[in-house]
Each structure stands twice: as structure tokens, then as C-alpha cells.
């Protein structure tokens, strides 16, 4: 490793003095002006990770649902999953190192991880459509090449497409072809095979309106739609030709504001969905005959998918370990419906998609979605092989169910949550079951809920357990929350510290909106009093 050359090149990507950023679930994210040095250094780190794992590593330049002026970067591990936690720490150390310490930090990573520097390295790079992304991805390439790594620049991709490419490259082609065409063809063939089962006798062609958040999703959906256009018409809105990325549109806006995005015309009963800026999240919604807006979030998406998978498994007659993974933010009604009606086991993990993904890997079939619409389904290799064998061997109704399940398996992007893949899965299931969007929404009724934030002097005062549903410290807080919850019907509440700033997040749900609002307010007052609240005391919102 020519550290002299690295240091010389690093000086051309100088770090702003005193800037400290932490590698989190979403990698690094901040204003694009501050990211040049981080991009270069993540190129360096990707080479070391590639040498250590003897695999292709991915680097994605994106800031997902953040505003257009921001950008970010995250590394993708060999199976398309997020970077290993120990390497997240290396990323933080390397990004935060002052210029004179870069050499030392790199040497320490090499020693600690026993990196064989003679090993070849291969890195694949992609970016979203932000104005800053092309220049920043060149800084990544600069870091890769100065350490002698080889690379392939995919140019513009959605984040889940890059995860898919990494997985394909490291599976020796078993998972699919590591090209955009390979991705489009695999998903489209599975979708067309599924929708061909649906009788079209006089039916109007199915269509869905898609808000693409003025991001990369529009570009990639347009590239792909001709592959499956016979089965589904997609009408694109916020396609990047006019508005700003994520501005008053996109999945995050729709979920947080509980209203439709700008730039989309909604008629009663029409299915609409929104992607986020890098197309790894999706939420659905519609307006009823009275003009009321209805959101269908990740909880209801997981319920639709897992219920359908359970039905297919029952038809095939296979006993398979199927589980759904949620976070504490999942609506209580969804958990009750899955456990009590569908008899599907539900597991709760800490917030953060990497926790859900890892838990889902423990099942034969693991379905996970965060309420924000980020999720997918994972199938063990043994289950995939078995289902595809049954699909070929069986002729009767069992064979048809096995073939349907085999196509569903191919339609999922198992490397990461993928808005395009998830949309096609949802559209296929709705078509096969003959469900309208209103009927899907009516599977269960969400419990009213409220989320609040409380400013505190130090968020570390609060620690949690039981997948963030119980507060351990400060003493007395959890007991006081329990006493408040007992006053309301079908109620629960929890508090958790933010991962990035000194605030505590409060969640409450109950059988009425007024009760949920009151409970959230009372819990936020407790946090303010017992956990060192600062600034203005929480005020009632009801």
C-alpha cells in the first residue's frame, strides 16, 4: 500500500477542519459541499473491505429522501446487505481523521482486520440524480484507484439496484445478471408470469399512478416499463422534469404529512404510490368517494405480502417457518391481525433497516417492512430450491400455487428494500386476489397514534431494552409510562433517543385520536421532567 501516494491524493480532497460525521444506518449524509473528502476516503475503505472479504463491494452516492442540496454515501457488503457494524466504526474514524492522521488510521484498519494487501479489489459505484452526485462519485473513484482497486461505474442507479448488482456479482450469477437489463428482465418476467394468470375478460387494463419524488425512480421505471406494459400501465408523476427532488413529494413527505404529494391528480378509488428519492421506500394511498385521503404504509404492505405467502404455503401443503419482522413503530392493529387472524408470528427489532434484515434472515421466509415503506421478503436457499422443484413436479392446484410462489420469489429484490420491486409484488398480489385498494386498506383499521419530539440536554440519559419498547434509564420513567398507559384503551407508548441529535422521540397509540394525543403529551411531559428536558415545556396539541 503506497501510503505516500494516498496522502498526496488525499490532500486534494481536504477535510474541512473540525468536521465530524458519523456513519449511521444510512451511511454519511450532510450538505453536499462538505462531502468531497468523505467520498474519497470511502473509496479507500471500499478497497480495503473488498480485499478483506475477497468480494465485490458497492459504493452508493445518494442521500435518499433528504433535500436536493444534501448528498451522502453508503457502502454495500458482499451479499447486497449493509456494511458490517465493525466497518461502520472504521468508516467513522477514517472520515473524521484530520489530514495528517489518514495514513495512521488506514494502517490501523489493515492491521485490525488482517487485510491482505496483495489481494485484488473490485468496487462497483452508482449514484442518484442529485446535481452533486456525478462529481462526488468521481471522488470515490479517485480513492479506489489510488489504492490500486479496480472498479465499474454503473452511473445512474436506484440504491436497491446497486445492492442487487453487488449480490449478483458475488453469487457467481446464481441470483441474476449484474446488469440493468438483467434486473429489468428478471423482475418483469416474474411479474408477467403472475399477471398472465389473471383473467382479463373485458377488464380495463390495470394502472397505477406513481409519484417518483423527482428522483432516480422515474428514470429507472421508464427504462423498465416496456418489459411489463401488457400487465400494468404506470403513470409517472414528479418525474424530475420540473420539480425539485423530494420537495413536497415522495414517500417520506406523504407518510409524515399524511397527505398526497404535489403534482399528482387523484380520482376517487385510484391506486397511487410514492417512491422516495433513491427508490428504496414505497407507500400507497387513495382518496375515497368523500375526498378523504387514506395512507397504506409499510405495515399494511407487510400484511398483504405475508398473508398471501401464508395462503400459498397452505395450498402447497408445505410447513415453512414464515415470520414477519417489525419495529416498535408498527401499528398495534397490524401486529394483532397478523398474530391472531393470520396466525403468522411477528418479531420486533430495534429501529433501523439493518436490524430488520438480519432478523428476517433467521426464517425460511422472512418479511420485513418499516412503517415508512422500506422492506422486502427474504427466502432461504433451501426454500427457494424446494419451491422451484415443486413448481416443476406438481400439476394440480398445488403445482399452480408453487409456480405462483416461485415467481413471487423472483419478483422480490432480496438484497434490499426496493420500491420498484415492491410495487410490482403488490400489483401482482392485488390482481391475483382481485382486491381493490379500498379492500386492501380494510383488512384492518389502524389504531390512532401520535409521535412527538422532546428536546433534552443529553439524549444518552435514556437507554432502552426490549427492541426499544422499554426505558431502562432514567429510573422511574418506564413505571410512570406504564401507569399512564393503563388509563387508556388498546394503548401503548414508548420513548427512544434519536440516533443523531439530542431529542427523545415519543410514540403513543390508543383507541381514539384524542386518547393517543393526550397519552403522547403526558409521556412527553414525563420525559421533559425526568430526562433533562430543555427549552419550552411540551404543550398539549388537543
UniProtKB/Swiss-Prot annotation:
Pathway: Nucleotide-sugar biosynthesis; UDP-N-acetyl-alpha-D-glucosamine biosynthesis; N-acetyl-alpha-D-glucosamine 1-phosphate from alpha-D-glucosamine 6-phosphate (route I): step 2/2. It catalyses: N-acetyl-alpha-D-glucosamine 1-phosphate = N-acetyl-D-glucosamine 6-phosphate. The modification Phosphothreonine is found at residue 62. The modification Phosphoserine is found at residue 64. Binds 1 Mg(2+) ion per subunit. Substrate binds at residues 370-372, 496-500, 505. The keyword DNA damage does not apply. GO terms for biological process: carbohydrate metabolic process; hemopoiesis; protein N-linked glycosylation; protein O-linked glycosylation; spermatogenesis; UDP-N-acetylglucosamine biosynthetic process. The modification N-acetylmethionine is found at residue 1. Its EC number is 5.4.2.3. Pfam families: AMG1_II (PF21405), AMG1_III (PF21404), PGM_PMM_I (PF02878), PGM_PMM_IV (PF00408). Its cofactor is Mg(2+). The active site is at 64 (phosphoserine intermediate). Keywords: Acetylation, Carbohydrate metabolism, Isomerase, Magnesium, Metal-binding, Phosphoprotein. One of its GO terms (molecular function) is magnesium ion binding. Mg(2+) binds at residues 64, 276, 278, 280. Belongs to the phosphohexose mutase family. Catalyzes the conversion of GlcNAc-6-P into GlcNAc-1-P during the synthesis of uridine diphosphate/UDP-GlcNAc, a sugar nucleotide critical to multiple glycosylation pathways including protein N- and O-glycosylation. PANTHER family: PHOSPHOACETYLGLUCOSAMINE MUTASE (PTHR45955:SF1). This is Phosphoacetylglucosamine mutase. It comes from Mus musculus (Mouse). The gene is Pgm3.
Amino acid at each position: 500500500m503506497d501510503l505516500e501516494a494516498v496522502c498526496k491524493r488525499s490532500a486534494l480532497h481536504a477535510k474541512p477542519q473540525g468536521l465530524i460525521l458519523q456513519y449511521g444506518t444510512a451511511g454519511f449524509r450532510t450538505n453536499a459541499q462538505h462531502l468531497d473528502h468523505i467520498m474519497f476516503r470511502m473509496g479507500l475503505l471500499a478497497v480495503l473491505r473488498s480485499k478483506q472479504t475477497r468480494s465485490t463491494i458497492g459504493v452508493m452516492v445518494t442521500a435518499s429522501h433528504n433535500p436536493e442540496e444534501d448528498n451522502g454515501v453508503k457502502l454495500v457488503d458482499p451479499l447486497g446487505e449493509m456494511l458490517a457494524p465493525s466497518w461502520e466504526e472504521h468508516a467513522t474514524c477514517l472520515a473524521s481523521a484530520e489530514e495528517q492522521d489518514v495514513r495512521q488510521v488506514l494502517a490501523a484498519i489493515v492491521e485490525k482486520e488482517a487485510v491482505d494487501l496483495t489481494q485484488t479489489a473490485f468496487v462497483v459505484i452508482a449514484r442518484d440524480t442529485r446535481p452533486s452526485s456525478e462529481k462526488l462519485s468521481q471522488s470515490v473513484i479517485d480513492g479506489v484507484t489510488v489504492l490500486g482497486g479496480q472498479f465499474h461505474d454503473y452511473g445512474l442507479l436506484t440504491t436497491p439496484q446497486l445492492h442487487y448488482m453487488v449480490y449478483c456479482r458475488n453469487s457467481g450469477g446464481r441470483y441474476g445478471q449484474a446488469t440493468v437489463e438483467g434486473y429489468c428482465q428478471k423482475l418483469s418476467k416474474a411479474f408477467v408470469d403472475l399477471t398472465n394468470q389473471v383473467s382479463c375478460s373485458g377488464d380495463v387494463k390495470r394502472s397505477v399512478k406513481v409519484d417518483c419524488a423527482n428522483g432516480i425512480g422515474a428514470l429507472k421505471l421508464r427504462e423498465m416499463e416496456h418489459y411489463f406494459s401488457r400487465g400494468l400501465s404506470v403513470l409517472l408523476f414528479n418525474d424530475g422534469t420540473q420539480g425539485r427532488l423530494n420537495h413536497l413529494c415522495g414517500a417520506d413527505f406523504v407518510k409524515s404529512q399524511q397527505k398526497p404529494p404535489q403534482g399528482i391528480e387523484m380520482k376517487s378509488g385510484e391506486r397511487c404510490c410514492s417512491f422516495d428519492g433513491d427508490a428504496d421506500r414505497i407507500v400507497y394511498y387513495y382518496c375515497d368517494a368523500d375526498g378523504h385521503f387514506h395512507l397504506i404504509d409499510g405495515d399494511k404492505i407487510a400484511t398483504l405480502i405475508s398473508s398471501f405467502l401464508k395462503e400459498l404455503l397452505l395450498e402447497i401443503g408445505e410447513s415453512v417457518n414464515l415470520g414477519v419482522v417489525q419495529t416498535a413503530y408498527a401499528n398495534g392493529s397490524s401486529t394483532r391481525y397478523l398474530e391472531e387472524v393470520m396466525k403468522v408470528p411477528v418479531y420486533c427489532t430495534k429501529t433501523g433497516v439493518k436490524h430488520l434484515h438480519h432478523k428476517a434472515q433467521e426464517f425460511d421466509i422472512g418479511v420485513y417492512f418499516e412503517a415508512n415503506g422500506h422492506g422486502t421478503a427474504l427466502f432461504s436457499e433451501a426454500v427457494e430450491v424446494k419451491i422451484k422443484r415443486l413448481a416443476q413436479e406438481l400439476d394440480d392446484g398445488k403445482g399452480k400455487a408453487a409456480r405462483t410462489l416461485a415467481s413471487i420469489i423472483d419478483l422480490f429484490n432480496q438484497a434490499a428494500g426496493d420500491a420498484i420491486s415492491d410495487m410490482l409484488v403488490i400489483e401482482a398480489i392485488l390482481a391475483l386476489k382481485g382486491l381493490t385498494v379500498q379492500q386492501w386498506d380494510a383488512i384492518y383499521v389502524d389504531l390512532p397514534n401520535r409521535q412527538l419530539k422532546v428536546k433534552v440536554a443529553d439524549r444518552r440519559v435514556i437507554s432502552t431494552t426490549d427492541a426499544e419498547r422499554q426505558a431502562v434509564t432514567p429510573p422511574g420513567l418506564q413505571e410512570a409510562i406504564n401507569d399512564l398507559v393503563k388509563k387508556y384503551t388498546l394503548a401503548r407508548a414508548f420513548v427512544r433517543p434519536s440516533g443523531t441529535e439530542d431529542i427523545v422521540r415519543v410514540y403513543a397509540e390508543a383507541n381514539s385520536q384524542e386518547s393517543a394525543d393526550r397519552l403522547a403529551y403526558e409521556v412527553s411531559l414525563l420525559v421533559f421532567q425526568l430526562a433533562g428536558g430543555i427549552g419550552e415545556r411540551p404543550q398539549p396539541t388537543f
